[in-house]
């Protein structure tokens, strides 16, 4: 008898999800995890020439409790891996990760025991950004792609279950160093 009976199926929920997606993508707060030369390029995107503020990212947050995007920029050592995971766990949901540069994505040229061969074995990664180091324009493009992903993401209980399953699947994947024939 009400308005919801006259609307097509899924109309109201779709509209709410689109509005919430627009709000979430327009107010992403990044936390920096700059570990090497990629961090210099990441800092450049916040300067006047590239102006990251026009995408709703005014200030890089110093506290993970105030951030929902982690940009891992540079190589991650074995000693830094637990700290990276702790910072990720302290971030509120929903949270996203950009792996910036080949060192963060695959260990880069540092194929040894001290460097983690891909940050995706510590935290689930949403966007991989190649380059050594990637240009600020590439980081802006990755952020825009993440905005598209955020805007189309689902809300509610199903979203939490999907995020949990995706994180478990990402962390169970084989490290690159153990993939036979790939690095030899």
Swiss-Prot record:
Q: Please, which domain of life does this record's source organism belong to?
A: Bacteria
Lineage of the organism: Bacteria, Bacillati, Actinomycetota, Actinomycetes, Kitasatosporales
Q: Which HAMAP family match?
A: NDH1_NuoB
Question: What the protein does?
Answer: NDH-1 shuttles electrons from NADH, via FMN and iron-sulfur (Fe-S) centers, to quinones in the respiratory chain. The immediate electron acceptor for the enzyme in this species is believed to be a menaquinone. Couples the redox reaction to proton translocation (for every two electrons transferred, four hydrogen ions are translocated across the cytoplasmic membrane), and thus conserves the redox energy in a proton gradient.
- Can you provide one Gene Ontology molecular function annotated for this UniProt record? NADH:ubiquinone reductase (non-electrogenic) activity
GO BP, one annotated term: electron transport coupled proton transport
The record's subcellular locations are:
Cell membrane
Keyword list (alphabetical) reads: 4Fe-4S, Cell membrane, Iron, Iron-sulfur, Membrane, Metal-binding, NAD, Quinone, Translocase, Transport
What gene codes for this chain?
Answer: nuoB1
Protein known as: NADH-quinone oxidoreductase subunit B 1
What the entry lists under InterPro entries is as follows: NADH_UbQ_OxRdtase-like_20kDa (IPR006137), NADH_UQ_OxRdtase_20Kd_su (IPR006138)
- Which Pfam families did the record assign? Oxidored_q6
Q: Which organism is it from?
A: Streptomyces griseus subsp. griseus (strain JCM 4626 / CBS 651.72 / NBRC 13350 / KCC S-0626 / ISP 5235)
Its cellular-component GO annotations read: plasma membrane; respiratory chain complex I
């Amino acid at each position: 008898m009400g308005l919801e009976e006259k609307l097509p199926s899924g109309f109201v929920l779709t509209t709410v999800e689109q509005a919430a997606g627009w709000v979430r993508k327009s107010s992403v707060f990044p936390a920096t995890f700059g570990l090497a030369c990629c961090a210099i390029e990441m800092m450049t995107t916040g300067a006047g020439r590239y102006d990251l503020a026009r995408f709703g990212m005014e200030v890089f947050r110093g506290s993970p409790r105030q951030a929902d995007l982690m940009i891992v920029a540079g190589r991650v050592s074995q000693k830094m891996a637990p700290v990276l995971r702790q910072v990720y766990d302290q971030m509120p949901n929903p949270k996203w990760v950009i792996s910036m540069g080949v060192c963060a994505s695959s260990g880069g040229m540092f194929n040894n025991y001290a460097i983690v061969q891909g940050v995706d074995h510590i935290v689930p990664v949403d966007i991989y950004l190649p380059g050594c180091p990637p240009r600020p324009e590439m980081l802006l493009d990755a952020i825009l792609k993440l905005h598209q992903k955020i805007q189309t993401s689902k809300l509610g209980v199903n979203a939490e279950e999907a995020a949990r399953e995706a994180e478990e699947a990402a962390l169970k994947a084989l490290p690159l160093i153990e993939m036979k024939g790939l690095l030899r």
